[in-house]
A protein has these predicted regions:
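Multi-pass, polyprenyl lipid-linked donor-dependent membrane glycosyltransferases
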Residues: 77-84, 116-135, 139, 165, ...
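Membrane-interface transmembrane helices that cradle and orient dolichyl/undecaprenyl
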Residues: 132-155
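Loop-to-helix entry region of an early transmembrane alpha helix in multi-pass inner-membrane enzymes
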Residues: 55, 59, 69-87
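Juxtamembrane segments of multi-pass membrane glycosylation machinery
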Residues: 45-47, 51, 63-77, 97-98
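Membrane-interface alpha helices of multi-pass inner-membrane proteins
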Residues: 151-169, 173
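Extracytoplasmic catalytic/substrate-binding loops of multi-pass membrane glycan-assembly enzymes
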Residues: 24-39, 49-64
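Start-transfer (signal-anchor) and selected internal transmembrane alpha helices
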Residues: 1-21
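Transmembrane-helix signature of polytopic, membrane-embedded enzymes
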Residues: 86-116, 130, 149
Length: 174
């Protein structure tokens, strides 16, 4: 079935507004979000990751924090990550289930969980999800059609990118 781009864009925008922008505007950010914003600022002040301050996320995540300087511009990357996650999750789900209703319910459940779990923090995991779901999509495409074996290198590259964004969740769920 065709990818419901409009539905994915609407859910992505709602989740981004509720979990990434609203906490900043209302001043109810979590400790994780405050620490991530601080890291973006500290890197610009000459701080070193893992030496001058504690960090448990991946190097690419901290590079992104350095680029956006811990600002609200980060919400644009968060939005893109949720958009990619929704698209690749939909593609992976339709590869193993031909029931459109259940696939759409899975998509709604994903966005509700992503919004609830990342309210004010946990952004590195959300940024890693498109790469994890892309790898899942490629692996499921191979399982459905074993003649389609072009993608193992892409699976490895996507898992590596996910690992450099959020090492612990990637190691646990890949």
């Amino acid at each position: 079935s065709p990818i419901p781009f409009l539905r994915i864009i609407i859910w992505t925008t709602l989740v981004t507004l509720l979990s990434a922008i609203t906490p900043v505007l209302l001043g109810v950010t979590s400790l994780q979000h405050s620490a991530d914003s601080y890291i973006g600022w500290a890197l610009h002040q000459g701080g070193d990751i893992y030496t001058n301050f504690f960090g448990s996320e991946g190097l690419l995540y901290y590079l992104l924090q350095f680029i956006v300087k811990g600002s609200i511009v980060f919400a644009a990357f968060y939005w893109l990550a949720l958009l990619g996650s929704g698209i690749f999750l939909f593609r992976a789900a339709t590869a193993i289930s031909k029931r459109d209703k259940q696939v759409h319910q899975l998509l709604i459940g994903f966005y509700l969980l992503a919004g609830g779990l990342s309210f004010g923090g946990g952004y590195a995991t959300i940024l890693a999800l498109p790469f994890l779901f892309y790898g899942l999509d490629l692996a499921l495409a191979y399982m459905v059609d074993s003649n389609n074996d072009k993608g193992f290198l892409r699976i490895g590259m996507s898992m590596a990118l996910a690992f450099f964004l959020a090492p612990l969740p990637t190691a646990l769920y890949s």
